[in-house]
């Protein structure tokens, strides 16, 4: 099952409209998971080291297991992980409901030649769209683009190419949305003209 980036973004927008209708940043993903979706976040020590999995949902959607150290120590990364799992909840609910073991999760994530690894791409795209809503990220893009270009001009430097410009902008935008600079850069590359 392939879901386009545009469709994934639309699903994230509909989800936000229901659970965070003012679309303000940063999106309160932990509250949405625990209060609105009523999914308990369960940190597990050594999950990543033992199973090579950051997080996974229970098949009945009552618990979201996440690596303890990842959850407690890396806020922007754990926020993305929670949003990623919400992506599975929204986009792949029927498939996730059939997964009853950690081994099945591993096969789901890796694909094992079945083409299911595309689900991970969907969930990553959903997480980026959820945590950095389209209108808000576009507005911030315009602000940061002008700021960075003005800095280069003031220093007497040539305005860099688009890719380099996005890298410069990503740090500030990441802070606003409480995501990693890499997540911000990827999202910017999808929405910038």
Which stretches of residues belong to each language-model region?
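Active-site hotspot residues in diverse enzymes, especially metal/ion-binding acidic/histidine motifs
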Residues: 1-193
């Amino acid at each position: 099952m392939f879901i386009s980036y545009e469709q994934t973004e639309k699903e994230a927008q509909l989800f936000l409209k229901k659970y965070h209708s003012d679309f303000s940043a940063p999106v309160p993903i932990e509250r949405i998971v625990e209060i609105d979706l009523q999914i308990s976040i369960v940190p597990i020590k050594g999950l990543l080291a033992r199973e090579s999995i950051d997080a996974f949902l229970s098949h009945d959607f009552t618990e979201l297991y996440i690596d303890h150290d990842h959850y407690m120590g890396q806020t922007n990364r754990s926020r993305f992980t929670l949003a990623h799992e919400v992506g599975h909840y929204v986009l792949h609910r029927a498939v996730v409901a059939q997964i009853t073991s950690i081994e099945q999760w591993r096969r789901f994530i890796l694909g094992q030649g079945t083409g299911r690894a595309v689900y991970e791409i969907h969930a990553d795209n959903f997480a980026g769209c959820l945590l950095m809503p389209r209108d808000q990220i576009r507005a911030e893009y315009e602000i940061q683009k002008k700021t960075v270009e003005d800095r280069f001009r003031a220093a007497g430097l040539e305005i860099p190419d688009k890719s380099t410009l996005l890298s410069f902008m990503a740090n500030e935008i990441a802070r606003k949305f409480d995501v990693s600079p890499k997540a911000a850069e990827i999202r910017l590359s999808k929405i910038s003209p």
